Amino acid sequence: MAEIHTPYSSLKKLLSLLNGFVAVSGIILVGLGIGGKCGGASLTNVLGLSSAYLLHVGNLCLVMGCITVLLGCAGWYGATKESRGTLLFCILSMVIVLIMEVTAATVVLLFFPIVGDVALEHTFVTLRKNYRGYNEPDDYSTQWNLVMEKLKCCGVNNYTDFSGSSFEMTTGHTYPRSCCKSIGSVSCDGRDVSPNVIHQKGCFHKLLKITKTQSFTLSGSSLGAAVIQRWGSRYVAQAGLELLA
């Protein structure tokens, strides 16, 4: 026998659909958090603590995303079982999650301008102190070699950053092999600094641009998820009250 469609049954289906939107926004946040953690980890190795906030925001998005997915599932259960307590719990919890998401996005947008000022000096000093060379196994040197090769740059400001550094004192070279345009060429000897041999520009501004992109992606996506959740939770509350009245 076909199911009789009544306003009551339609309201239950609407509640289930709205909670599905809430769960989808949570999945978006989980993906965003994973991406933020992966990208933030690499940047933190190079830029240091000045970019560590990306990791923290990524962790926060991951946690909030998992909570939102659970709330969406709980809301769906509350709608199908007509549980007033479950629906009220989900609605109140979503309000808290929304506040956290908006706060996280605001912190990222406000904090980013400070990163450039703090990161430049910190990254410069750390590079001169901790960078060891092209084939060195330590994580710091490995990450910097990868950055210089992929971004086609040399040092923080330029190749002169290695002058007087621990790297030069240890190897006697003016720049590492990863600064060369062609790593296997004979002219890449650590002394020839001509534009045909090594990259003349530093990596800092390129790294800062990547950090800016990731920061705005995190904040924008977090606000986007918050809009979806705000819309969903609003109608969940209205429909839930009508259903359980």
Swiss-Prot record:
One of its GO terms (cellular component) is plasma membrane. InterPro entries: Tetraspanin/Peripherin, Tetraspanin_animals, Tetraspanin_EC2_sf. It is found in: Membrane. The keyword Ribonucleoprotein does not apply. Residues 35-37, 81-94 are extracellular. CDD domains: uroplakin_I_like_LEL. The keyword Transmembrane helix applies. The chain crosses the membrane at residues 14-34, 38-58, 60-80, 95-115. Broadly expressed in most human tissues and cell lines including neural and bone marrow derived tissues. Gene3D superfamilies: Tetraspanin. This is Tetraspanin-16. The lineage of its organism: Eukaryota, Metazoa, Chordata, Craniata, Vertebrata.
